[in-house]
UniProtKB/Swiss-Prot annotation:
Protein name: NAD(P)H-quinone oxidoreductase subunit T, chloroplastic
SMART domains: DnaJ
Gene disruption: observed consequences: Malfunction of the NDH complex.
Top-level taxon in the UniProt lineage: Eukaryota
PANTHER family noted in UniProt: NAD(P)H-QUINONE OXIDOREDUCTASE SUBUNIT T, CHLOROPLASTIC (PTHR45283:SF1)
Length: 249
């Protein structure tokens, strides 16, 4: 009996520690899982977003434009060529030609040629007018002929050179366009507003004379003298009646 009791006690002593060790092992496993999950989360957070994958070495990812000079800064463009193209487009514009034709008192009108005249027409007009305005062959007064001949040489120097003629045409078109814009603005404005803008106050007579008396004309002086004589005659008549006339009469 004693042997059986001691055996049960020894067995219970062996089983209880195993049960306690098993519960402790379960708790340790849960704690280890929590720690592992935290570490994995920290690793993922520290790595950040994933970078895009690089393209293959043989793949061209650039943007291709239809023109090699389009879409790129510092393309292969010639500044002189661009300026020449702009001038050509400007001179070939119909509106530009109309502006030059609408001008008045221009070099073309002085020569008597059209705005699109070529160099031969300009030379022919210059030779014709030089004979007319030259001081030795002119029928005009010498001063007038000299002024016109000097202007003729200036006009020919401007229109005979291609560059100076382009610049002159450009300035002439700008002048005509500005004048047309001013006319359009005047048409759109209110007439009453135009009258108000052009109104100038007329100062009083005293303000215009600066405080001085106005000078009288000869006719005004004659009329004033006649008025004074009439007043004096009336005064003399009254005095005569009062002094020399008999009161009984």
């Amino acid at each position: 009996m004693a042997y059986a009791t001691s055996t049960y006690a020894r067995t219970s002593c062996i089983i209880l520690p195993k049960i306690q060790n098993g519960a402790h092992f379960t708790d340790d496993t849960k704690a280890f899982r929590r720690i592992t999950a935290r570490r994995v989360t920290r690793i993922y957070a520290s790595q950040g977003p994933t970078k895009p994958s690089k393209p293959s070495p043989g793949v061209d990812t650039r943007i291709h434009w239809e023109s090699p000079d389009e879409g790129w800064i510092g393309g292969r463009s010639d500044p002189a060529k661009s300026v020449d193209e702009d001038k050509t487009n400007l001179l070939s514009d119909e509106k530009f030609a109309e502006l030059i034709k609408d001008s008045f008192d221009s070099h073309y009108q002085f020569l008597g040629v059209s705005t699109d005249a070529d160099l031969e027409e300009i030379k022919s007009a210059y030779r014709r007018l030089s004979k007319e305005y030259h001081p030795d062959t002119t029928s005009l007064p010498l001063k007038t002929a000299s002024e016109k001949f000097m202007k003729l040489r200036e006009v020919y120097n401007v229109l005979s050179d291609e560059e100076t003629r382009r610049f002159y045409d450009w300035t002439l078109a700008q002048e005509v366009a500005s004048r047309q814009a001013e006319k359009m603005r005047m048409k759109l404005e209110d007439p009453k507003e135009q009258d108000f803008r052009g109104y100038e106050s007329i100062p009083d007579m005293v303000d215009r004379l600066g405080g001085r008396n106005m000078e009288l004309s000869d006719q005004a002086m004659t009329a004033l003298t006649f008025d004074i004589l009439i007043v004096l005659f009336a005064v003399c008549c009254i005095a005569f009646v009062i002094v020399f006339k008999d009161p009984s009469y």
